[in-house]
Amino acid sequence: MDISKLLKDRKILILIIFVTLSVFLIVFKGLDFGIDLSGGTIIVLKAEKPMSDKEIEATIKIITERLNYNGLNDVVIYPRGNDEIIVEIPKSCDTDRIIKILKQQGVFVAKIDNITAYTGSDVQNVELPTKIPQGETWAYGVPFELTLEGAKKFAEVAKGKAYHKVELYMDGKLISAPVLSPDLADGKPHPQQVITVGAYPPTKEEIDEAMAIYSALKSGALPVKLDIEYISTISPEFGKEFLKGTAIALLLAFIAVGIIVSIRYKQPKIAIPILITCISEVIIILGFASLIDWKLDLPSIAGIIAAVGTGVDNQIVITDEALKRGAGKIRASIKRAFFIIFASAATSIAAMLPLFVLGVGMLKGFAITTIAGVLIGIFITRPAFARIIEEMFKKF
């Protein structure tokens, strides 16, 4: 076998380029692991009643927005059934702060003398918490703007009630009660409003409270009330042990494949390209995961193993066809093998697509890595392997 000739082949060069890029991504960009491997907290939120598909979508969108507004964008959120929302929190995030945000339904009401002046649905613009002039001093709070309709409602309720308290409630809890100034009690619409949480400069607790109010007003109220059903903490030690066990299992699997292939074909050298192709496939899949910032979890690892298993099957099909037809018809035999491989790949992808499109959480992770592995196999690693086999058997 002419190795120097192989290294100049387009299919082999493509494989080498992808493996090199993948190694670069893995080393310098790193891999993200799900909480089942890196540790973290799982929170199960229970809805007070079954939710429709639109309510589930709106709930996840609102929770995601609230967390993003607070700089907590590494949290994974997905539904389970029609009455539960699962929240996965990495160990690097402030779990207590997230729990506080999750407890908010975000129902905002302003009352004067126990009469509703406006609600969260009347709020149209919300600004980030900032310092606000308050007489001769400064306060810290959340400025916001009412719609014209909301401002008119407030004007009607506030008219003639100077120095009465404007009680602001979030989820039934009083969060602020400023005194109504005379200029806001003149019966005219005043869209600009503010919720103060304390004096300026604020404490950390006041900053967190203001951000929670800001995110609740900005995202709107949840369509249904959610309660925390239970909280589960996952130790990172479990993930480390699993990854260690997976690495050992893959190593043993590669050794077993090498031995079985050597016995099956009575040619140990055939096992070498099969093993190199399998290892290359794993590296490219991991590089792809690093590129798209996909969090690798237990099902994702299972998907990688499944893809590698499929890869070994495909390589055996290519090898069998090449040996069966002989040197004179080796190209035709490999072409026939690829017909079988493409049909098998199409079946695998078709089986995974429903999980990818409709699946959430763990199911989606399995589908993504399996589909990625199959596509990487048929377009990158299998053609390279076939070229090696063609060169290896051309004299047979």
Curated annotation (Swiss-Prot):
Keywords: Cell membrane, Membrane, Protein transport, Translocation, Transmembrane, Transmembrane helix, Transport
Assembly and oligomerization: Part of the protein translocation apparatus. Forms a complex with SecF.
One GO cellular component term: plasma membrane
SUPFAM superfamilies in the record: Multidrug efflux transporter AcrB transmembrane domain
Principal localisation: membrane
Biological process according to GO: intracellular protein transmembrane transport; protein targeting; protein transport
A Pfam family it matches: Sec_GG
Membrane topology qualifier: Multi-pass membrane protein
Organism: Methanocaldococcus jannaschii (strain ATCC 43067 / DSM 2661 / JAL-1 / JCM 10045 / NBRC 100440) (Methanococcus jannaschii)
Functional note: Involved in protein export.
Gene3D superfamilies listed in its UniProt record: 3.30.70.3220, Multidrug efflux transporter AcrB transmembrane domain
Subcellular location: Cell membrane
Classification via InterPro entries: SecD/SecF_arch_bac (IPR022813), SecD/SecF_CS (IPR022646), SecD_1st (IPR048631), SecD_arc (IPR024912), SecD_SecF_C (IPR048634)
Protein name as it appears in the record: Protein-export membrane protein SecD
Membrane-traversing stretches: 12-32, 243-263, 272-292, 298-318, 338-358, 360-380
Family note: Belongs to the SecD/SecF family. SecD subfamily.
